[in-house]
Amino acid sequence: MAATNETKMEYTRLGKSGLKISKVILGAMSFGSSEWQDWVINEDEALPLLKHAYDVGLNTWDTADTYSNGRSEEIIGKALKKYSIPRNKVVILSKCYFGVADDGTQPPISASMVNDGAMVNQVGLSRKHILDAVDNSIARLGTYIDVLQIHRLDRDTPREEIMKALNDVVESGKVRYIGASSVSFNAW
């Protein structure tokens, strides 16, 4: 059952944009693998929740590449396909900054924050990492990203480089809007 005119969900503009999002946002940090964190639910439990959210008009789903090392994004992509949810009916927010292990292992959060060794150039907001992270998120989701948020401010990367890379992923059509998560206004 798709959302109908009788849906009680209310929608609001996202910031100063024209994009409308549900006032309630479904956070998907807890979707993925308990190997990442013991409180995470698996795909079989998460998929029906995404379907129900869609059915009641909750059209905004928030995830990040680092959640369960990419599994959260994969589950959202599977829900779109499994339930034939029209892509234009949901708003997908994702984030980049933290590293995602290439080998499919579930590194602890602390290991995904170090831009060195095995994770060099896979953490932070360098142009390289932003472009790679977006491509990888799109591969996991199977679709474009409506809102890409930086998950933290990267003080080691020039702000101009960050903003140029974010602009470029929007200009490419891979991302529709940009934003920030866990960043204070004064940080800039």
Model-derived regions: residue spans:
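N-terminal binding-site loop/beta-alpha segment at the start of enzyme catalytic domains
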Residues: 1-91, 100
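Conserved beta-strand positions
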Residues: 26, 63, 94, 147-150, ...
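Glycine/proline-rich, positively charged
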Residues: 34, 106-188
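Beta-hairpin (beta-strand-turn-beta-strand) motif
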Residues: 66, 95-97, 153
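Generic beta-strand or strand-like secondary-structure segments
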Residues: 75-79, 91, 95, 129, ...
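Eukaryotic helix-linker segments that join adjacent hydrophobic helices
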Residues: 84, 95, 101-115
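Glycine-rich beta-alpha junction loops
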Residues: 96-98, 184-185
